[in-house]
Amino acid sequence: MRPRSLRSALTGLAASTAIALAWPAMAEVVNLKAPMNATNQVPPNSSKGTGTLTATYDTASKKLSWKGSYSDLTGSATAAHFHSGEPGKNGGVAVPIAPATSPLEGSATLTDAQATDLLAGKWYVNVHTDANKGGEIRGQVTK
């Protein structure tokens, strides 16, 4: 092989190696949290219920994983969901959480649009009961 061809081959190999090594560094696991209470609901209610949810979002696999718990609700939970929605606004269900019994645990693979909203703070989690069908406790999901 001529020196020029060898130099080109080595340059290409070095560039390919650098890209391959950098690729995993581009992936990120984002830690998220959502403290839940009745005053965060829209509209607020008088429940003494509280809860916490922690989550991680893996930007490479697009997987959202969560764990949470709650207590002191007015009755049994009838549903729990992640919703799209900014603080102070209600939004549609983005990801159901099932079962809704405490402790909560699960995972879901998100779409690009869902991930964008989640990481921008435009998601909340809430727990519903018979007494508060629209949601008894709510927490905005933040980093």
Specify the residue positions occupied by each region the protein language model found.
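Metal-centered catalytic cores of metalloenzymes
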Residues: 2-5, 12, 17, 21-80, ...
